[in-house]
Amino acid sequence: MAKVEGSSENIVQDGAQPVKPRILLAATGSVASIKFESLCRSFSEWAEVRAVATKSSLYFLDKASLPRDVILYTDDDEWSSWKKIGDGVLHIELRKWADIMVIAPLSANTLAKIAGGLCDNLLTCIVRAWDYSKPLYVAPAMNTFMWHNPFTKRHLEVISELGIVLIPPITKRLACGDYGNGAMAEPSMIYNTVRLSYKPSTVNGSG
């Protein structure tokens, strides 16, 4: 059974305060997921890190390149971890474990799912169950035409109402060859945004 750093009892019931903040990093189906390893390394120098990857992100993300102390969870772990009543449910355990969540990159598809309340994979189940008194950051990555699409504007408005913090994309040459806005912010910018806004009082690990 896939578990989050030891038993669920230790996570939820012992009330121990971690020395470092607990950060859940997530990657979705964008070519910018090739930078996820760099993001994990940056955060793991400061925080206790766990990672979640959607099925599509695995086309770009090299699991073997992640830091050894960063456990990566996928949809397969969600479905293999529950056997009977009383077993921990992975997306709930991760929701309780994390003090902060960062989705980088956030694809247009996953943005639409979150805005619509869908929960059809491990990541979107965590977001649907998220305690919005705890910080949740997103760093979108998509083609310029998708970024400027009216649907994207609506979806960003919806997640803003939930209190989700946007780390805006940047303008550069995109993977498709187009030049424009839509590239994920650099990992250093994402890290600095989260680190500078961090308040120790947010550390609770109990959801």
Model regions and ranges:
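A cross-family phosphate/adenosyl-ligand binding-site feature
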Residues: 1-138, 143-207
